[in-house]
From Swiss-Prot:
<dbReference type="InterPro" id="IPR013328">
    <property type="entry name" value="6PGD_dom2"/>
</dbReference>
<feature type="binding site">
    <location>
        <position position="15"/>
    </location>
    <ligand>
        <name>NADPH</name>
    </ligand>
</feature>
<comment type="similarity">
    <text>Belongs to the NAD-dependent glycerol-3-phosphate dehydrogenase family.</text>
</comment>
<feature type="binding site">
    <location>
        <position position="195"/>
    </location>
    <ligand>
        <name>sn-glycerol 3-phosphate</name>
    </ligand>
</feature>
<dbReference type="GO" id="GO:0046168">
    <property type="term" value="P:glycerol-3-phosphate catabolic process"/>
</dbReference>
<feature type="binding site">
    <location>
        <position position="285"/>
    </location>
    <ligand>
        <name>NADPH</name>
    </ligand>
</feature>
<feature type="binding site">
    <location>
        <position position="259"/>
    </location>
    <ligand>
        <name>sn-glycerol 3-phosphate</name>
    </ligand>
</feature>
<keyword id="KW-0963">Cytoplasm</keyword>
<dbReference type="Pfam" id="PF01210">
    <property type="entry name" value="NAD_Gly3P_dh_N"/>
</dbReference>
<feature type="active site" description="Proton acceptor">
    <location>
        <position position="195"/>
    </location>
</feature>
<dbReference type="InterPro" id="IPR006109">
    <property type="entry name" value="G3P_DH_NAD-dep_C"/>
</dbReference>
<dbReference type="GO" id="GO:0046474">
    <property type="term" value="P:glycerophospholipid biosynthetic process"/>
</dbReference>
<keyword id="KW-1208">Phospholipid metabolism</keyword>
<feature type="binding site">
    <location>
        <position position="143"/>
    </location>
    <ligand>
        <name>NADPH</name>
    </ligand>
</feature>
<feature type="binding site">
    <location>
        <position position="260"/>
    </location>
    <ligand>
        <name>sn-glycerol 3-phosphate</name>
    </ligand>
</feature>
<comment type="pathway">
    <text>Membrane lipid metabolism; glycerophospholipid metabolism.</text>
</comment>
<feature type="binding site">
    <location>
        <position position="259"/>
    </location>
    <ligand>
        <name>NADPH</name>
    </ligand>
</feature>
Amino acid sequence: MNASDASMTVIGAGSYGTALAITLARNGHRVVLWGHNPAHIQALQAARCNQAFLPDVPFPDSLQLETNLGQALAASRNVLVVVPSHVFGDVLRQLKPHLRADARIVWATKGLEAETGRLLQDVAREALGETIPLAVVSGPTFAKELAAGMPTAIALASTDREFADDLQRLLHCGKSFRVYSNPDFIGVQLGGAVKNVIAIGAGMSDGIGFGANARTALITRGLAEMTRLGTALGADPTTFMGMAGLGDLVLTCTDNQSRNRRFGMMLGQGMDVQSAQDSIGQVVEGYRNTKEVLALAQRYGVEMPITEQLWQVLYCGKDAREAALSLLGRTRKDETAKL
């Protein structure tokens, strides 16, 4: 493959980054995949699959592995960043000196900036400047199913109409992968952060043994919290009824492929936070997101009782069952008031 003819460079060779790279390559595009660990990239190249996360999915011939960041970024103007949210800013700053003059950045990272709770668009602007086109993809996607070619749908939002159209064309596959465009850049970002938090709560409820009624109540009221916060930030509330909101929320709250849900289940069964994280063995985005989302809600004066109780469990040692009872014992409310 020539150095500058790739349709996309993917930054991040974990399960989701690899799955997206495979999907793009399967669509007939030339793709470069880079990861921060050269030994890992060399292992992917030798096996022509991601044996750690997706061992049963071979790489298409048009998927190239690259250990050199400069060469990876020279290969395409389109750069897809798929890294944990707590390193998102650091990775963008690492990329900046190597980006092409015509570069465009899209991310599939879900979450907020660690400590500050800022939206990733603000982190990207600070790291990359005001002129580079930005985009985000988000929605109900488990890496294993996406990589296997199972039917999947996501949402896409961008600051640049041409970039959005190009991304939709690159990603969309009529056989398995449907990409919906959405003009709500804020809402598509926020949904992916809040759903991580609520998924921990849903898992915790199931771990305690509360059953389907309680899980459904948590999903429904979690969606209300997501919508309230999004509206306060200027998002379109209808976004949260779509793929980046309700879609992703239902997926992560109900299926054990979700690390956030499994983490919550372990807490509900009595495991401590550190042991549960160690048992998962991968990043549990919702753990950090809980603190970040709550800080953002407090900054905007938005009531988020589920998020607050989860913060009490994760960071203050509150018992999971006691947190659930605190929610049930709250003052009576009108369901649709300030939804």
